[in-house]
Amino acid sequence: MNVAIVGATGYGGIQSVNLLKDNKNYKISYLGGYKTSGTKWSDNFPFIKLDSNNLIEKISIDRIADKADVALLCLPNGISSTLTRGLLEKGVKVIDLSADYRYKSLEQWKRIYSNEAAKYKRDDDDLCKEAVYGLPEINNKDISKARLIACPGCYPTSALIPLIPFLSQGIIDNEGIIIDSKSGTSGGGRESSQKLLFSECGDGLSAYGLINHRHTSEIEQIASFISGNDIELLFTPHLLPMIRGMHSTIYGRLRDPGLTSSDCRIILENFYRNYSNIRVLPVDIYPSTKWVKNTNEIHLSVKVDNRNGRIILLSVIDNLLKGQTGQAIQNLNLISGLPLNNGLEMINHYP
């Protein structure tokens, strides 16, 4: 299958090239960029060898359609919407790594992404409704038949995977869910930003986006769908002075306070028994971001505080892989009829 990587020189694009360049099931048939168009891949990234198709082209719907069956859109929020309809009309399937199609309502996207909405005058509510949310653990059948897939954000991925087994079975209350997440700086993208300068974020830990972080509404949308009830939760992200990795600690109230840590671990393990990239750790073993770095795995742990009937869920992912591009490749595999983790059998070179 021929794959176009659009936005090839951002972190999402770089990871996509790395994951697909040696995969015999796919051919990277097109590399597209804005600022880097007209340059060679090897000039930008001499340490990542491509045997062919070394030129980064100007982004063009016609060129993508001529050369690719599927387009991975690794672009800033808002830009994907300027390409998607044209690509779909020409028969190109789209896997979008931005937030443009994560919401079922265009109006909601416009409210949450108001700055982008002011810049990009969208009129594609029909595509928002059509897009399939690309979390394979809950949508693998719909993903396999989709022509437009919206890859989840990194924070929602790290929060929803541990929550879904308990929300879907009504094991935890819909109220009082708290998500405390920490991310490496690569989650902010490759564009320069003062807060991501080493002298600004090094040797420090800081929260940001309290109450109104964009991923709050994304998590709430999917959590509400899974539980069948409207859910409002508290989500606080933090910036860690490391390059890649994400750690989420999630708190909830058990409806049956008699459940133990072992009971809840079994619930997690049974729910994800068919997903080899999801590892449920033994009780009292708590995951480290270092364990999943450079892999598409997610490690989960659970502990119950029987004094107050609370459950504590822990998850770690590599924010650039399971939190972004690795998940996009899982979606690509599903629409290609291939095993979910094809090409994602990566080894963590610990330490």
UniProtKB/Swiss-Prot annotation:
The keyword Cell division does not apply. Its EC number is 1.2.1.38. The active site is at C154. Keywords: Amino-acid biosynthesis, Arginine biosynthesis, Cytoplasm, NADP, Oxidoreductase. PROSITE patterns: ARGC. It is found in: Cytoplasm. Pathway: Amino-acid biosynthesis; L-arginine biosynthesis; N(2)-acetyl-L-ornithine from L-glutamate: step 3/4. Pfam families: Semialdhyde_dh, Semialdhyde_dhC_1. SUPFAM superfamilies: Glyceraldehyde-3-phosphate dehydrogenase-like, C-terminal domain, NAD(P)-binding Rossmann-fold domains. GO terms for cellular component: cytoplasm. InterPro entries: AGPR_AS, AGPR_type-1, NAD(P)-bd_dom_sf, NAGSA_dehydrogenase, Semialdehyde_DH_NAD-bd. GO terms for molecular function: N-acetyl-gamma-glutamyl-phosphate reductase activity; NAD binding; NADP+ binding. It catalyses: N-acetyl-L-glutamate 5-semialdehyde + phosphate + NADP(+) = N-acetyl-L-glutamyl 5-phosphate + NADPH + H(+). Belongs to the NAGSA dehydrogenase family. Type 1 subfamily. HAMAP family: ArgC_type1. Catalyzes the NADPH-dependent reduction of N-acetyl-5-glutamyl phosphate to yield N-acetyl-L-glutamate 5-semialdehyde. This is N-acetyl-gamma-glutamyl-phosphate reductase.
